[in-house]
Design a protein with these regions (language model features):
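Histidine-acidic metal/acid-base catalytic patches
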Residues: 1-4, 9-27, 96, 150-166, ...
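N-terminal pre-domain/capping segments
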Residues: 1-92, 162, 189, 245-258
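Active-site-proximal loop/turn and secondary-structure-junction residues that shape catalytic pockets
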Residues: 9-11, 35-37, 62-65, 103-107, ...
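Active-site acidic/histidine proton-transfer and metal-coordination neighborhood
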Residues: 13, 51, 70-169, 174-176
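Residue-level detector of anion-binding/catalytic polar loops
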Residues: 29-30, 55, 97, 136, ...
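Conserved beta-strand positions in the central sheet of alpha/beta enzyme cores
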Residues: 32, 58-60, 100, 138, ...
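Glycine/Thr-rich phosphate-binding loops of Rossmann-like dinucleotide-binding domains
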Residues: 41, 65, 109, 204, ...
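Catalytic-core regions built around general acid/base machinery
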Residues: 44-52, 122-132, 183-186, 218-222
Length: 258
């Protein structure tokens, strides 16, 4: 497996290329940026990645919270689709094959049935772009009151009958709903990428890696069981070099099965 982190984990006071150099120095093979809306920023990141040898893991789509694909307002759904197309193009231009997408948000104005149908209709519209660019749409489990069981998540992904729609599994996000290693074994080959973070069930908050209630040895074993060889990306609170070094070391222990 390859080790990565979200770009925002790295010190914000450094220039972009220096941030990637630090990532490489501390043992990260890749970084995950958010959607870039300016071509100049895409070119800058691509050049920094080439100069440092750090890969772009995938692109985290940015429009899906402000403009959910499940919104009752067509205008918002269209904005979300447009933002996702930008993210898919970003990934292609940066040499990646995956974009993270939050598919829907269930709330007081959007019921579960509507979230399911609207998000599926929107993603179906995005599949031709994904296919053309060679970039997968990876649906992530987040705190959006949607896809609340591994069987449902599996069926949702399978409903598209397309290799361009996959799962982006977040280990820490799922802990209040279920057992991460169980979800991994059910989702299996559908998993395109994995976010890792840790969570304290008693305090009900995210905590540093290996300081919460995630059973990391069991998660590691489940990943071996499904023969996952892709990216593990730390989506955690970052900071200075010392903080990021600690994140890298914690990930090394997780990868070692400790």
């Amino acid at each position: 497996m390859k080790k990565g982190c979200c770009l925002g984990v790295l010190p914000a006071d450094l220039e972009l290329e220096a941030r990637l150099e630090l990532a490489r120095k501390l043992g990260f093979d890749g970084v995950e940026p958010n959607t870039l809306t300016r071509k100049a920023d895409v070119q800058k990141l691509r050049k920094a990645a080439q100069n440092t040898g750090v890969q772009i893991i995938d692109v985290m789509n940015s429009a899906h919270w402000k403009y959910p694909l499940s919104s009752p307002r067509k205008r918002d759904r269209e904005r979300s689709i447009k933002g996702m197309r930008t993210s898919l193009q970003n990934a292609h231009d940066l040499g990646s094959d995956t974009v993270l997408l939050v598919p829907a948000v269930v709330n007081d104005e959007v019921g579960y049935r509507e979230a399911w149908s609207r998000s599926r209709a929107a993603i179906r519209r995005l599949i031709p772009t994904a296919r053309k660019l060679g970039v997968r749409i990876a649906v992530e489990n987040v705190w959006n009151r949607f896809l609340l069981s591994p069987l449902e998540f599996k069926d949702y992904v399978d409903s598209f009958d397309s290799k361009w729609v996959r799962a982006y599994f977040d280990v820490g996000n799922i802990l209040m709903l279920g057992v991460p290693q169980d979800w991994i074994r059910i989702l299996r080959r559908r998993i395109a990428r994995i976010h890792i973070k840790d969570f304290d069930l008693k305090a009900r908050q995210f905590v540093p890696l290996r300081e919460g209630d995630v059973q990391w040895p069991e998660v590691r074993k489940a990943l071996d069981d499904i023969r996952y060889t892709g990216w593990l990306t730390a989506e955690v609170r970052g900071g200075d070099e010392k903080t990021v070094r600690g994140i890298s070391r914690a990930m090394d222990k997780i990868l070692a099965g400790d």
